Curated annotation (Swiss-Prot):
Belongs to the ZIP transporter (TC 2.A.5) family. GO terms for cellular component: plasma membrane. Keywords: Cell membrane, Ion transport, Membrane, Signal, Transmembrane, Transmembrane helix, Transport, Zinc, Zinc transport. Plants overexpressing ZIP4 show decreased zinc concentration in shoots and seeds, and increased concentration in roots. This is Zinc transporter 4. Residues 1-30 form the signal peptide. It is found in: Cell membrane. Induction: By zinc deficiency in roots and shoots. It comes from Oryza sativa subsp. japonica.
Length: 396
């Protein structure tokens, strides 16, 4: 009985407390929780602000580092023309080009194309390109490779036609020498070479006449075919110019994308490893592009313009990413689709250029095929370039 009397006041107090909680205003019950959330939000905002400032510092470092690395890479072959070992017809240049081709091939196959598949297969991007859907990334890469082949062929044909339609000198020293040989062999008539260029047959005929002067006649409306060593050299230079311009187009598209992606990132932990990886990436790609520019024999102005465009594209992309970082979301549907399509196109261009215009042209060169030591050195350089660029995929 006494125990019941002692417990009654406690029960009454507990009941009063429950009733007070029940009738208390909703704000009073959550005031402490709201205060805690405000403190948590303030701390999170402070951390986010510190991350943003650290990320901005790293982005500025990345702009300077990538700019310097790209410029150094593209200038190595260009300035290397002053050294006999690095001239376009030297053995060392074959190895440098093979290394650069391996870098470009790995860039397309290991870096860009998988990223394109991931972007187009992402659920945020609508699930295009992977899973049970259609592989749009592969389709775009294939279309870009075929378009590159068409541009390569059409542009080279146009430049050849425009070059060989130009007026040609009539009295060629080689023809004059051959004519002199005929005269020394017992020709009865003395004089100069009378040249008839037959476009339909694609060759020139030298006839010795008794006239005391030379004549040049051109028959037909089509240009003469490139049969002389000089014409073959011009055709090869035209091919190298087209290759270098199309290759730079593919590299520029890719450089803008990776620059914007890095510039829009807000986490220092994700930017820090990219600075070094992308610097090496731009350096190796610059070597490949610089080698093509050297072989194309561009004038100094065109060389400077192409080197400048390559060097500035990725840093400009980073600056653009910084400018739009507040509104840009790389995980949005639009961003993923655009990035996936452009990455696929860039991958198709670079894969085609590395295999067809760089590797196939050099590995079918008689100078390489008749030199076993040079062949082994070039293969080693190719595998080294592709391997080193593939290794960078761990960080970038």
């Amino acid at each position: 009985m006494d125990a019941m009397r002692q417990s009654t006041p406690r029960a009454m107090l507990l009941l009063c407390a429950v009733l007070m909680l029940a009738v208390a205003p909703p704000g009073a019950a959550t005031a402490a929780a709201v205060a805690g959330c405000e403190c948590g939000n303030a701390a999170a905002a402070a951390v986010a602000g510190e991350d943003a400032r650290g990320a901005l510092r790293l982005k500025l470092v990345a702009i300077a580092s990538i700019l310097a690395a790209g410029a150094a890479g593209v200038l190595v072959p260009v300035l290397g023309r002053s050294f006999a070992a690095l001239r376009p017809d030297g053995d060392v240049f074959f190895a440098v080009k093979a290394f650069a081709a391996g870098v470009i091939l790995a860039t397309g196959m290991v870096h860009i194309l998988p990223a394109a598949f991931d972007a187009l297969a992402s659920p945020c991007g609508g699930g295009r390109g992977g899973g049970g859907g259609f592989p749009f990334a592969g389709l775009v890469a294939m279309a870009a490779a075929m378009a590159t082949m068409m541009i390569d062929s059409v542009a080279a044909g146009y430049y050849r036609r425009s070059h060989f339609k130009k007026p040609r000198p009539v009295d060629d020293p080689a023809d004059a020498a051959r004519a002199a040989g005929v005269e020394e062999g017992g020709a009865e008539h003395a004089g100069h070479v009378h040249v008839h260029t037959h476009a339909t047959h694609g060759h020139a005929h030298g006839h010795v006449h008794s006239h005391g002067h030379g004549h040049g006649h051109s028959h037909g409306s089509a240009p003469a075919a490139a049969t002389s060593p000089e014409d073959a050299s011009v055709a090869e230079t035209i091919r190298h110019r087209v290759v270098s311009q199309v290759l730079e187009l593919g590299i520029l598209v890719h450089s803008v994308i990776i620059g914007v992606s890095l510039g829009a990132s807000l986490r220092p932990s994700s930017i820090r490893p990219l600075v070094g990886a992308l610097s090496f990436h731009q350096f190796f790609e610059g070597i490949g592009l610089g080698g093509c520019i050297v072989q194309a024999n561009f004038k100094a102005k065109a060389t400077v313009i192409m080197a400048t465009f390559f060097s500035l594209t990725a840093p400009v992309g980073i600056a653009l990413g910084i400018a739009i970082s507040s509104s840009y979301s790389k995980h949005s549907s639009t961003a993923l689709v655009v990035e996936g399509v452009f990455n696929s196109a860039a991958a198709g261009i670079l894969i085609y250029m590395s295999l067809v215009d760089l590797l196939a042209a050099d590995f079918n060169n008689p100078k390489l095929q008749t030199n076993t030591k040079l062949q082994l050195a070039v293969y080693l350089a190719l595998f080294l370039g592709a391997g080193m660029m593939s290794l960078l995929a761990i960080w970038a």
